[in-house]
Amino acid sequence: MKVFLGLLLGYSTILILTYQSPTTQHPPKEELEYWCTYAKTCDFCWDCQNDTCINKVINESISMNSIVNCRVTRDSQSQSCFYEISLKIPNYHSMECSYPRLYKHFMSMEKWRDENWPILIRHYCFYLVFSFAFAGCVAFAICKNLRLRTTMKLLMLLSILVLLSQPILNN
């Protein structure tokens, strides 16, 4: 019985190993185009020298600070491709190999890079001030025992001011 269980365990291990490629930080060169298309800032996609990195597939350049360590696995049994992305907090991205999709976290990192930080900070500061104004308006209405209709008018006026100020914030 023990021999039978040992053979069964050994056979299942061989089957698992044939269906799943090992996790690697260095995928084969012929697969680089595939892996680098859907998680663009993985370290194996870039050739870095002197704080400048050039993409091995599309000849694009990027700052060395944007590069993250990645490991990839392809499971041929379930037809899934898996990225393990090591930022400060590990992230994972799984997709069907035949229907790949972009890793959204990288896209948002690219949008917020460099020139967009001042706009982002302005927006957050504005919304913080707006939140205090909104809370102050509600507190004022409660303290003065204003009727609901008057309170709603004050809140609508505050909301209109927020909407009108949006184009100014985006400049």
UniProtKB/Swiss-Prot annotation:
Q: What is its main location?
A: host cell
| Keywords linked to the UniProt accession | Host membrane, Membrane, Transmembrane, Transmembrane helix
One cellular component (GO) term of this entry: membrane
Domain of life of the organism encoding this protein: Viruses
Q: What topology in the membrane does the UniProt record assign? A: Multi-pass membrane protein
The answer to whether the entry has keyword Transmembrane helix is: yes
Q: Does the entry feature the keyword Transmembrane helix, yes or no?
A: yes
Query: Can you name this protein?
Result: Protein MGF 110-12L
Q: Which organism is it from?
A: African swine fever virus (isolate Tick/Malawi/Lil 20-1/1983)
